Every structure is written in C-alpha cells, then in structure tokens.
C-alpha cells in the first residue's frame, strides 16, 4: 500500500466520497479521484472548498489527517481519535 499527501488548491471545488474514493469536482467536472485508504494527509489550500461529512469520516477513519489552510499557511488540523488519546482509557 502506498500513502499519499493530497493538496487541494483549486478554489470552489467540492470533495465527496464515492465507493471508497475521494472525488474532487468543480463546475460539474471531475478533476480527480484517489482511494481514501491510500491517503496519509489531505491539505486544503483553497478557502472555498466544500467537504462532505463522508469525506471527513472516511479520511479520519483511515488514520489520515486533514490540514486546513488560509493564505497557504496551516490554521488547523483535523485528527482521528486514535491519534489524540488511547482508546483503552474510555473503554473502562
């Protein structure tokens, strides 16, 4: 399995999940597709990118992170629970 860092720099595009793939569309045209399980990180550079909840859940479920940027500088990170705490703590 290969891991990729995906940069989304196209302003006004939308990210959706279809059959395990992250799909990027703009103006009704598909710009690209990649298997969510192959991602280690998604870097959102464009400020007007629409992301579906299924994409958030899919990326985080596969232990990847999402980095949010403004003016091409990181301003926040979405991280899966497995990277923020030990699950054994909440099981007991």
Show which residues each predicted segment covers.
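N-terminal intrinsically disordered, cationic/polar leader segments
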Residues: 1-92
């Amino acid at each position: 399995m290969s891991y990729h860092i995906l940069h989304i720099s196209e302003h006004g595009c939308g990210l959706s999940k279809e059959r395990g793939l992250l799909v990027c569309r703009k103006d009704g045209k598909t710009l690209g597709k990649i298997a969510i399980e192959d991602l280690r990180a998604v870097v959102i550079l464009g400020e007007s990118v629409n992301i579906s909840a299924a994409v958030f859940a899919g990326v985080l479920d596969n232990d990847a992170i999402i980095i949010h940027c403004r003016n091409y500088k990181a301003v926040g990170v979405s991280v899966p629970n497995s990277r923020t705490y030990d699950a054994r703590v909440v099981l007991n």
